[in-house]
Regions:
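Short, intrinsically disordered N-terminal pre-domain segments
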Residues: 1-16, 174-175
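Exposed regions on extracellular, virion, or secretory-pathway luminal proteins
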Residues: 2, 10, 79, 107-110, ...
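Beta-strand signatures of extracellular beta-sandwich domains
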Residues: 99-103, 144
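Hydrophobic core residues within well-ordered beta-strands of beta-rich domains
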Residues: 98, 129-131, 167
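Terminal (often C-terminal
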Residues: 15-96, 104, 117-118, 124, ...
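Glycine-rich strand-loop-strand elements at beta-sheet edges
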Residues: 68, 104, 109-138
């Protein structure tokens, strides 16, 4: 004899939903995740750190995205290990080095960087740098991205309205 259990949600004893089941019968756990993107051209001066400007939230399950301060905020509810990706498309990159540095605090150009990712000079006029990393964030951490380039003048990020993600910060909790 077969049994059928019909539910829309599986809840924790504390009352929060742990797993939602869609109309197709597939479950999607409410694992914390975020995607914040750029949608405007940003000028990056030569030889100084410049914070990535984020302009829109694509997905944000736990109010991570802080558009006012251009960062992702972590709390005691969302602390843990995340798989993160940062990416930016550049327009006419003329510098020898283009760097994206992921940091976990509000201190720019300090000792609080998770990792430095560098791109060499592009052979064409456009270059898309994309990097993925794991990091364990604590309750007071943030995720912000700083640019650095060593050209003789400013370079610009590239933003095409037809493309959904020219520049972005994303992550989801894995542990």
């Amino acid at each position: 004899m077969a049994s059928t259990l019909k539910v829309q949600n599986i809840a924790h004893t504390g009352g929060t939903n742990a797993i939602a089941i869609d109309s197709g019968g597939f479950s999607f756990d409410k694992r914390p995740h975020f995607i914040a993107k750029t949608n405007q051209v940003q000028s990056i001066p030569a030889s100084q750190y410049t914070q990535m400007q984020i302009h829109a939230s694509v997905a944000d399950t736990h109010n991570f995205i802080d558009l006012s301060n251009n960062r992702i905020n972590f709390s005691s509810d969302t602390a843990g290990t995340y798989l993160c990706t940062i990416s930016q498309k550049m327009n006419n990159l003329t510098s020898n080095r283009f760097m994206m540095a992921a940091r976990y605090s509000n201190t720019q150009n300090g000792n609080d960087y998770i990792a430095y990712f560098e791109e060499n000079r592009a052979e064409s006029s456009y270059s898309q740098a994309t990097y993925t990393f794991l990091y364990t964030f604590t309750a007071s951490n943030v995720l912000a991205v700083d640019y650095y380039q060593d050209g003789s003048g400013a370079v610009n990020t590239y933003t095409a309205t037809a493309a959904a993600l020219n520049g972005f910060i994303s992550g989801f909790k894995i542990g």
